[in-house]
């Protein structure tokens, strides 16, 4: 039950008020108001009661947020504030509203990080001369170099393991609790020594302590690295997929073997074009094969070898029939004329005379006067007066004429198939462009224009002069 809602209930005073000696330094009137705040009738100002500059609104946990209006409320609030300053803190003070910490957005995060590193460097430099290091399972050459750096910072390196060692440096990743009791790693764990890996000492402690200049020009180093990156990869605001002059993008299936350390240029680069017309795959593709077989061999060579000289029979038959029909059409005209001549002339053959004079002396015959024109004589010739029976016989003989051998044709049509020669593609560092055919690129105008200028190879000429074999003096 809230004591503010019941006026007849007296105010319960804390017994710590009487026991607190600081309450004796307050004026008698203020002390009376604190001990019994409901007994006064005269209004007292805040200036007389609260001389410690305490704010009454910060003590909202003393009373509920919603309360009825009471007389002399200002004096009562001031009395409560003074009493709270006199009393020790209680558990209710945790509910007070605390001011929130707002981050200053104007301070960049990089400056905060640099300032923290500077404090860390200062503290470690002051404490470093008190350190004693001991190296376990570390190479002697590395130990010698690290010892020199540690001595420059003022610390010491112990050659023998003692309990005066503060930092135990090792390369072993074994848990110290799993080691033998006589192992130095187990002893260092029991002695509460700092156990560091060698990588932590080199890359985190010594590197940060010795390279203090890297924190000074942080913005300058970032700007320089940004400029170097723009020279190689272009500006950062540019789209990466937009073609660049200094970068060659792969557009088809490619094979690129790079150096893992990125010290050397790519060892092998090959790109294959997509063939949309034919379904032939030019790039290497893995196939499911038996154990011990090459996964890149799909058996296409074996199929071509079998079908090279064993073509289907119906294709050869079509070729033979086409050649035979063309030959028969040419022979029909010749045979029909010869058959008609034999039927008319009988068994008579015209032969050349063996007399010499017959060849030299021309024979003249008198021309008849009633000679008809050629057109009329052709119409009255026996060829046009043949009976239908003779014409049918001629057609039968023409069809029964013996076949002649067809014209010669290639036994293997695939023997003259064009063989595709693979061109050698690559990248020309002189022209700064990528080529698909090396021979065509070397004969091009762009490459020859660069190769014909001697000033482009001035660096090589100077290098050859330096490495030239000296002439013998004798």
From Swiss-Prot:
Pfam families tied to this protein: DBF4_BRCT (PF22437), Dfp1_Him1_M (PF08630), zf-DBF (PF07535)
GO molecular function: nucleic acid binding; protein serine/threonine kinase activator activity; zinc ion binding
Source taxon at top rank: Eukaryota
Subcellular location: Nucleus
Domain (BRCT) ranges: 125-178
Xref: PROSITE patterns: ZF_DBF4
Swiss-Prot/TrEMBL keywords: Meiosis, Metal-binding, Nucleus, Sporulation, Zinc, Zinc-finger
Cellular compartments per GO CC: cytosol; nucleoplasm; nucleus
Role, per record: May act as a kinase regulator. Essential for progression of meiosis II and sporulation.
InterPro entries, alphabetized: BRCT_dom_sf, DBF4_BRCT, Regulatory_Dfp1/Him1, Replication_Regulatory_Kinase, Znf_DBF, Znf_DBF_sf
Protein's recorded name: Sporulation-specific protein 6
Zinc finger (DBF4-type): 421-470
Organism from which the protein derives: Schizosaccharomyces pombe (strain 972 / ATCC 24843)
Gene Ontology terms: biological process: ascospore formation; meiosis II; signal transduction
UniProt-listed CDD domains: BRCT (cd00027)
Binding-site residues, Zn(2+): 428, 431, 441, 447
